[in-house]
């Protein structure tokens, strides 16, 4: 039987995805593919909470430091490169583990976005948003009306089928070629927000301000500069706000981003979450992964 099992660890910023990903990779002979839109950039280490060299030495990591910060990295780029990496890792007899919080990237990978490149991307995302508002019954009815012979429908396959009717060739497979296990991490909101605030303070101690200043001075208009943890300091550098106000902006925007991440994973991807502070964590996840891989 073809080996096509892929683990996917998602959740809000600062919840502990990196640590779990490394634990899973060690326990199940895996390699990690970053699903973070900012960690692809060389030199942006602190503000992106990039995995450290010590962490990368424990298990192989991919899609880290693969772009200069003057280059763009799109959802299309991610899906193409992640699919190739998944194949290479599976061919080695190892387990690919996607770890990240960029919902659009991960959803597009799982649902098999390879619909003719970026030119169709906006239209496809609009259709996907419309389909995501339908109930399962409404979705399945649309699919069966087009092809009554389709069996074993689930929500993901139904959305993929309807996308292909609009944008892709009709003989493509429904969804990705891989079998994904989604692992969602979460924590009590107050605890999570406290962790976010503490992490920003730690980033400041590690030199985030200098990293942001370098980006501001060299390439303030690039895609990488739009990430949380950098753009908030630009008004400080131009003399419009105080440093304290800039730091508070980073914390506020990070908390808001965490909320948006949770909304995306819950509503658009139907992720079930594990509380990282539950008594037996992460043993239930290990049990679920063992069952999935076997």
UniProtKB/Swiss-Prot annotation:
Keywords: ATP-binding, Magnesium, Nucleotide-binding, Transferase, tRNA processing. ATP binds at residues 11-18. GO terms for biological process: tRNA modification. SUPFAM superfamilies: P-loop containing nucleoside triphosphate hydrolases. GO terms for molecular function: ATP binding; tRNA dimethylallyltransferase activity. The record marks 102 as: Interaction with substrate tRNA. It is an enzyme of class 2 (transferase). Its EC number is 2.5.1.75. Pfam families: IPPT. Gene3D superfamilies: P-loop containing nucleotide triphosphate hydrolases. InterPro entries: Dimethylallyltransferase, IPT, P-loop_NTPase. Substrate binds at residues 13-18. Residues 36-39 are annotated as: Interaction with substrate tRNA. It catalyses: adenosine(37) in tRNA + dimethylallyl diphosphate = N(6)-dimethylallyladenosine(37) in tRNA + diphosphate. The keyword Protein transport does not apply. Monomer. Catalyzes the transfer of a dimethylallyl group onto the adenine at position 37 in tRNAs that read codons beginning with uridine, leading to the formation of N6-(dimethylallyl)adenosine (i(6)A). Belongs to the IPP transferase family. This is tRNA dimethylallyltransferase. The lineage of its organism: Bacteria, Bacillati, Bacillota, Bacilli, Lactobacillales.
